[in-house]
From Swiss-Prot:
Subunit structure: Homodimer.
GO molecular function: methenyltetrahydrofolate cyclohydrolase activity; methylenetetrahydrofolate dehydrogenase (NADP+) activity
HAMAP family per UniProt: THF_DHG_CYH
The protein's annotated pathway: One-carbon metabolism; tetrahydrofolate interconversion
Gene3D superfamilies in the cross-refs: Leucine Dehydrogenase, chain A, domain 1 (3.40.50.10860), NAD(P)-binding Rossmann-like Domain (3.40.50.720)
Membrane spanning residue stretches: none
Name of protein: Bifunctional protein FolD
Gene (name only): folD
C-alpha cells in the first residue's frame, strides 16, 4: 500500500481562489482588508517567511504593510508601535514575526495585540475561546492541519489522534481542535518513554517537533493518517519534515509531504483570519 498524498499546495490554491472572491466583495463595499507585519532583526528565515506572507496577501488582494525594526529596538518602542496599529482602522490584522530578540518578551508582545486583530490566534483571549469552543481566530498551522484532514474526507469523530509535540503554537492547540471534532487525543513529547508504543496507537498521527525524520515506519500503525508539520533543513540544504516520508508512505493511508504540505496551508489560514477580521470590524 502506498499512501495518498494530501497536497497543501493544491488545497491552498483552491481556498485562496475563494478568499480572493470574498476580498473582492469586501472591497466592493469599501473595505480593503489590511495586514500589518512587524519584523524585528535580520534573521534570514524570518525574512523569507515574511516575503511568503506578503506574496500570498497580494495574490488574494489583501493589502500588506511591513514594518521592519533593528534587533536593538526596545520592548517599549515595539509595544508602542503595536498599540498604534491597534488604533488604526485600516489595519485589520497584526502579525509579529517570531522569534524575537532575547530582550523582548514574546508573551508581552502577543498580549499587546488587540484580540480582534490577532490573526495568528496566539492571544490568551483567543486561545481561551478556542478551548471552550467559542468563535475565535484559530492558530494558523493547527487550523490548516484540521482543514487538510477534513479535505481528504477523513472522519475524525471517535478516532485516536496522537500529537507529537507540545508547543503553544502547534502541538497544544492542534490537539484541542481535534478534541472539538470528537477525537480521542493523546499528547507525546520529549519526556514520553517508548514513543513508538504511543504513536502506533494513532489513527491520525500529527508530528510537530522540528527533528528531521524522527518518525519512521516503526512508529506508524498500518493505514494511519500522518500529518508532518516539521520543517528541517538538512546539511545538503534540502528541506525535510519530522517524518521519514519515503518509508512512512509505504505504511500510512494518507501522508503530507514537506515541502508542499502543511506550510502553504498555514499562510492560507492567516489570509482567512485577516479577511474574517476585516469582515468583523466592518460589521461593528
Amino acid at each position: 500500500m502506498t499512501a495518498q498524498i494530501i497536497s497543501g499546495t493544491e488545497l491552498a490554491k483552491t481556498i485562496r481562489a475563494e478568499l480572493a472572491d470574498e476580498v473582492a466583495k469586501l472591497k466592493a463595499n469599501g473595505i480593503e482588508p489590511g495586514l500589518a507585519v512587524i519584523l524585528v532583526g535580520d534573521d534570514p528565515a524570518s525574512h523569507s517567511y515574511v516575503k511568503g506572507k506578503q506574496k500570498a496577501c497580494a495574490e488574494v488582494g489583501i493589502r500588506s504593510l511591513l514594518y521592519t525594526f533593528p534587533a536593538t529596538i526596545s520592548e517599549e518602542e515595539l509595544l508602542a508601535k503595536i498599540q498604534e496599529l491597534n488604533a488604526d482602522p485600516t489595519v485589520h490584522g497584526i502579525l509579529v514575526q517570531l522569534p524575537l530578540p532575547a530582550h523582548i518578551r514574546e508573551w508581552s508582545v502577543i498580549e499587546t495585540i488587540a484580540p480582534e486583530k490577532d490573526v495568528d490566534g496566539f492571544h490568551p483571549i483567543n486561545v481561551g475561546k478556542m478551548m471552550i469552543g467559542q468563535p475565535a481566530f484559530l492558530p494558523c498551522t493547527p487550523h490548516g492541519v484540521l482543514v487538510m484532514v477534513k479535505s481528504a474526507g477523513i472522519d475524525i469523530a471517535g478516532k485516536h489522534v496522537v500529537v507529537v509535540g507540545r508547543s503553544n503554537i502547534v502541538g497544544k492547540p492542534v490537539g484541542q481542535l481535534f478534541l472539538r471534532e470528537h477525537a480521542t487525543v493523546t499528547y507525546a513529547h520529549s519526556k514520553t518513554p517508548d514513543l513508538a508504543a504511543i504513536t502506533r496507537q494513532a489513527d491520525i498521527l500529527i508530528v510537530a517537533v522540528g527533528k528531521a525524520r524522527l518518525i519512521g515506519p516503526e512508529h506508524v500503525k498500518p493505514g494511519a493518517v500522518v500529518i508532518d508539520v516539521g520543517v528541517n533543513r538538512l546539511e545538503s540544504g534540502k528541506l525535510c519534515g519530522d517524518v521519514d516520508f519515503d518509508a512512512v508512505k509505504e505504511v500510512a493511508s494518507y501522508v503530507t509531504p514537506v515541502p508542499g504540505g502543511v506550510g502553504p496551508m498555514t499562510i492560507t489560514m492567516l489570509l482567512h483570519n485577516t479577511m474574517e477580521a476585516a469582515r468583523q470590524l466592518a460589521a461593528k
